Regions:
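N-terminal signal peptide c-region/cleavage motif recognized by signal peptidases
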Residues: 19-21
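Extracytoplasmic metal-acquisition and chelation regions
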Residues: 24-300
Length: 300
């Protein structure tokens, strides 16, 4: 059953949708659930489609609350792209109002890493875009969804995707090499949310985090104590936190262990055009460089 909130925004959307005149456009209109997917999709689309994100730059996407304007925009789309793997729990109810709008789940075909603790234990870690091989699958799924919906431009989407994949590989491989130069016993990634499991796996790093998902309990005394113990036991030199949450728990871990606080990592959301990570490739580059610099500096 829909909540009163979703009933109200659904009604508002229908009224607004039929009352508003929309400028005609030959381009396919694509809506994504968050900015990382939007940037991937824009790179595949080029000039052949218009892509927008429901959530804004810098938004915390796990607990997002859709607005009436969001459902209007999505109702007018030719295609909706979403991540799946329990990331956009808000979107599943949101999308139930738009069964006639084609959609694609971009994690199809990805082998997930399971969450190891908390109320989401055993479920897939949804942050699969943080792994290079997974990102290539996302891009292929976007090409497939675009081509099915807009077959006339299928060759354009394929060519754009091939170029984007080359750019992605060129961005990641030097970063992977920088991490590989760090001594293996120092190659730990300690973060607030367990959102970096795919990055840690691909870079040959061990992982420790305060909480598994931002939708779960965040920064409890028990979580902080467990990570403090883990940092001390493994002589981990640096801890990080991501951009969309309170960094205080990670900073407490650093203070109580003598580890360095290495700064902010990006995962769930891009920044605005003037920010640090306006694109997905920037997000991967800045996050990986921050990790490499933090571990290298702390290890010297």
């Amino acid at each position: 059953m829909l909540s009163p909130f979703f009933k109200s925004i659904s009604t508002a959307a229908v009224i607004t949708f039929f009352a508003t005149s929309v400028c005609a456009s030959d381009k396919m209109k694509v809506v994504t659930t968050f900015t990382v997917l939007a940037d991937m999709a824009m790179n595949v689309a080029g000039d052949a489609a218009d892509v927008v994100s429901i959530t804004k730059p810098g938004a915390e996407i796990h607990g997002y609350e859709p607005t009436p304007q969001d459902i209007v925009r999505a109702s007018d789309a030719d295609l909706i792209l979403w991540n799946g793997m329990n990331l956009e729990l808000w979107f599943e109810q949101f999308f139930s109002n738009m069964k006639d709008v084609p959609s694609a789940i971009l994690t199809n075909g990805i082998i997930p890493i399971s969450i190891s603790a908390g109320s989401y234990e055993g479920k897939p870690n949804p942050h699969a875009w943080m792994g290079l091989n997974n990102a290539l699958i996302y891009i292929d799924n976007i090409v497939m969804a675009f081509s099915n919906q807009d077959p006339e431009n299928a060759s354009v989407y394929k060519a754009n995707a091939d170029a984007y994949k080359q750019e992605l590989r060129a961005t990641i491989e030097p970063l992977r090499a920088a991490i590989a130069r760090i001594p293996e016993d120092r190659r730990w990634l300690v973060t607030c949310e367990g959102a970096f499991s795919y990055l840690a796996r691909d870079f040959g790093m061990k992982e420790l985090y305060l909480w598994p998902m931002n939708a779960d309990q965040m920064g409890t005394p028990q979580q902080v104590r467990a990570v403090i113990d883990g940092v001390k036991d493994n002589d981990i030199p640096v801890v990080f936190c991501e951009s969309t949450v309170n960094t205080a728990p990670a900073e407490q871990v650093a203070r109580e262990t003598g580890a360095a606080y290495g700064g902010v990592l990006y995962v769930d959301s891009l920044s605005g055009p003037d920010g640090e990570v306006p694109t997905y490739l920037d997000l991967l580059r800045v996050t990986s460089q921050t990790v490499a610099i933090g571990l290298t500096s702390a290890s010297n």
